[in-house]
């Protein structure tokens, strides 16, 4: 039937009707809240490039994690800022490293909150690349796998509930899965940054995490933003290697791929609403150009509607508050 028998506006007439037929629902339980943890005592340092986001000492990270949990957010994602860096990135697998210490403290204080640890070497290497760099300036994929596996085991022993490798080395999921299993950590899930693009939207994060490469860029290992079939292939390869959850990063410029990957795979799918996406909203809202609450909730709903089961977002606490 067509108009006038069919009138879609009938089901839009009231708030109750719109809620009754709503196809996509947004809940705090969908969110993961990223946090930047740093050494220091009673340190809470605002990140200018990411309004509303701070570098947190461990005590403040525990407090922030508790606030997230109280809002119904089930998980936090930890990024560490080490006190020192070296060529290998050895601070990543230090048993007393910043992520390991923060994980233990958060789990001790909030045992029901899931702690996800980002696994990459870029925050720990003096050159800012995500792996071992050869004398020719190339990231050595296979040499890096051993260090990633070592870091994964250290993070899991440190209290991480889920390991999230973001380095984009070939074979990293299989290497990490094997290392965890050998250490008696077969129950530790892997959430892989499977389709991680070489994106311009990471700018604020690289300042926040002090992880910009000292030379070159990451296009030789992160994905070309023009490629969709490759993103699906990367996810399927990671699943074959043992990934329990796959991820698309960034989210907003890649909603088509969130949908494709959701349709073509059978594991939970995460999407990362990244720093550049976040900061654009915060700056525009501060200037009075947009309604922050409305735009954030519309954005997160769009990511969920595209097919994401899990949304990693710096807006998590605000969005959870608005959804109460």
Report the location of each language-model feature.
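Alpha/beta enzyme core
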Residues: 2-3, 14, 26-32, 38-324
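N-terminal amphipathic/basic leader segments beginning at the initiator methionine
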Residues: 1-22
């Amino acid at each position: 039937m067509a108009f006038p028998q069919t009138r879609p506006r009938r089901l839009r007439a009231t708030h109750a009707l719109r809620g009754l037929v709503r196809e996509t629902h947004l809940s705090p339980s969908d969110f993961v809240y990223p946090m930047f943890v740093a050494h220091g005592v009673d340190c809470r340092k605002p990140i200018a490039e990411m309004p509303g986001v701070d570098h947190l000492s461990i005590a403040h990270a525990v407090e922030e994690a508790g606030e997230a949990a109280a809002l119904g957010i089930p998980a936090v994602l930890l990024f560490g800022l080490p006190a020192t860096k070296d060529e290998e990135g050895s601070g990543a697998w230090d048993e007393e490293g910043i992520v390991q210490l923060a994980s233990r403290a958060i789990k001790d204080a909030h045992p029901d909150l899931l702690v996800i640890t980002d696994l990459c070497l870029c925050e720990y290497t003096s050159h800012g690349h995500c792996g071992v760099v050869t004398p020719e300036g190339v990231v050595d994929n296979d040499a890096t796998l051993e260090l990633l596996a070592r870091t994964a085991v250290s993070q899991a022993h440190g209290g991480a509930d889920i390991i999230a490798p973001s380095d984009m080395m070939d074979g990293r999921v299989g290497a990490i899965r094997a290392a965890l299993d050998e250490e008696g950590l077969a129950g530790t899930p892997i959430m892989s940054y499977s389709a991680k693009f070489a994106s311009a939207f990471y700018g604020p994060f690289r300042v926040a995490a002090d992880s910009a490469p000292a030379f070159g860029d990451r296009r030789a290992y992160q994905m070309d933003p023009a490629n969709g079939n490759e993103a699906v292939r990367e996810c399927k390869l990671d699943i074959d290697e043992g990934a329990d959850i796959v991820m698309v990063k960034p989210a907003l410029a890649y909603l088509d791929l969130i949908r494709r990957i959701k349709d073509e795979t059978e594991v939970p799918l995460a999407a990362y609403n990244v720093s550049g996406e976040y900061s654009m909203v915060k700056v525009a809202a501060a200037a009075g150009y947009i309604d922050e609450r409305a735009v954030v909730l519309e954005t997160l709903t769009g990511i969920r509607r595209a097919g994401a089961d899990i949304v990693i977002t710096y807006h998590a606490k605000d969005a959870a508050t608005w959804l109460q």
